[in-house]
Amino acid sequence: MSRRRVYSEGTLAIMERFYQAMDACKAEKLISISDYCKETDIEKPHYYMQRKDRNRGFFEVGWMLPLVEKYHISAYWLMTGRGQMFG
């Protein structure tokens, strides 16, 4: 069980964009949550617990890498919220 964390507003905003990007990729049928969790070694319960409670403490920056490298989500957009999601 992960300890609760108090993330900064900036980190919470990045986390929110991560989940927005995941939803967009899922809607476009580019990924499934199960497959994404397997390929990134995210424990699926941690993915869902973190989504439900942003201060859960499971989130890692590495969760975003395949979105950028494989699914062409803009790293600039993930970090800043500016520009287009797909880059």
PLM regions: where:
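DNA major-groove recognition helix of helix-turn-helix/homeodomain DNA-binding modules
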Residues: 60-77
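Pre-recognition alpha-helix immediately N-terminal to the DNA-recognition helix
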Residues: 17-21, 46, 63-66
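Recognition helix of helix-turn-helix/homeodomain-like DNA-binding domains
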Residues: 41-59
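Conserved hydrophobic/aromatic packing and binding residues within compact polymer-binding modules
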Residues: 36, 47-50, 78
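Short, charged recognition helix plus adjacent turn
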Residues: 1-9, 76-87
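A short, Lys/Arg-rich alpha-helix, primarily the initiator
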Residues: 1-38
